[in-house]
A protein has these predicted regions:
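Interfacial loop-to-transmembrane junctions
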Residues: 264-285
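A short, conserved beta-to-alpha structural element at the edge of catalytic cores
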Residues: 216, 282-286, 301
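C-terminal transmembrane helix pair
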Residues: 261, 286-288, 292-293
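Juxtamembrane boundary at the C-terminal end of a transmembrane helix
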Residues: 295-301
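Membrane-embedded alpha-helical bundles of polytopic integral membrane proteins
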Residues: 1-209, 213-245
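Hydrophobic alpha-helical transmembrane segments of integral membrane proteins
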Residues: 105-106, 270, 287-288
Length: 301
């Protein structure tokens, strides 16, 4: 695959915008981060439902209560995953998300039975898979940002080790490493694959090559680990592990979404960003990487 400078320029500019938006959400406050991922969650769900309607025509017959109720239920998962320190009156924001979500779990199936044109368990399964694919990942990302200790100014935290005792900032840095690793992997995989890629990775995504995939992962891990070792002079093991998990799992996320698009017969999931398609095209890697990074963070950090 020959290197295409105009395509790369478009992809790079879109990636810069993406990273800038994500950094604003990370740097300002957990509230803004929740708002940002609420928008991402909504966009991913609408594109997911649109593609599922092409793959499974019966899904077009779900009621509006089902269509939007499941998105609200997924958003409640995100609220539940947020910090217990956020309160409305004397009630924690997390508890509000839990109880509204619990009510929806019981109400939505009854609404599906009463108002859908045809009750089809496949439709319920499709929505349940959407909750697992989209809502769970967004919830865990919010949990990493808001549910973990975070104090201090972000500019100081970028220059302190991950296991620092002088500032508890895991809630900022872990999401940052995920986003940076995926962005570097995506960019480097395209460059390496364009320059030296010859061996197709899979028929699901014909333009991807083994050379580009391996090169992207290795360069992503190298950049993040070297940053830890030489810029902030930190213990680099956590950085290496999180960047490797993000890059590898993110690649599988990219392939998964490519498979869904192929089944739906569409080139892009939407038209959010030039060179990157829709919400799912932009966040496919993140959706698969986050649960694995979250498990690592809970187990080892």
């Amino acid at each position: 695959m020959a290197f295409n400078w105009p395509v790369f320029k478009t992809r790079a500019l879109s990636s810069v915008v993406f990273v800038a938006v994500m950094l604003v959400g990370l740097m300002t406050s957990p509230w803004l981060f929740l708002l940002l991922f609420s928008v991402i969650h909504w966009g991913c769900w609408r594109e997911y439902q649109s593609m599922m309607e092409k793959i499974q025509p019966a899904y077009r017959d779900i009621s509006p209560f089902h269509r939007y109720g499941v998105i609200i239920a997924g958003w409640c998962m995100m609220v539940f995953a947020s910090s217990d320190h956020w309160k409305i009156g004397n009630v924690s924001f997390s508890a509000i998300g839990f109880w509204i979500g619990l009510i929806l779990i019981f109400v939505l199936p009854m609404i599906e039975i009463l108002f859908s044109r045809a009750m089809d368990l496949k439709n319920v399964r499709t929505s349940a898979l959407g909750l697992l694919y989209i809502s769970l990942s967004c919830s865990l990302m919010v949990n990493l940002r808001s549910g973990w200790p975070f104090i201090g100014d972000f500019s100081d935290e970028l220059l302190q080790p991950l296991n620092s005792t002088t500032a508890t900032y895991t809630g900022f840095l872990v999401p940052l490493i995920i986003i940076a690793s995926i962005w570097i992997n995506d960019t480097m995989a395209y460059i390496v694959g364009s320059l030296i890629g010859k061996t197709p990775l899979t028929a699901i995504s014909p333009k991807k090559t083994w050379e580009g995939t391996i090169g992207g992962i290795l360069l992503s891990v190298a950049v993040v680990t070297l940053y830890a070792a030489f810029v902030i002079k930190s213990s680099w093991q956590h950085y290496l592990a999180i960047s490797a998990i993000s890059a590898i799992a993110g690649t599988f996320g990219d392939l998964l979404e490519s498979k869904i698009k192929r089944m739906a017969g569409v080139k892009d999931s939407g038209s959010l960003m030039p060179g990157h398609g829709g919400f799912l095209d932009r966040f496919d890697s993140l959706l698969v990487a986050v649960p694995f990074v979250w498990l690592y963070a809970v187990a080892f950090m």
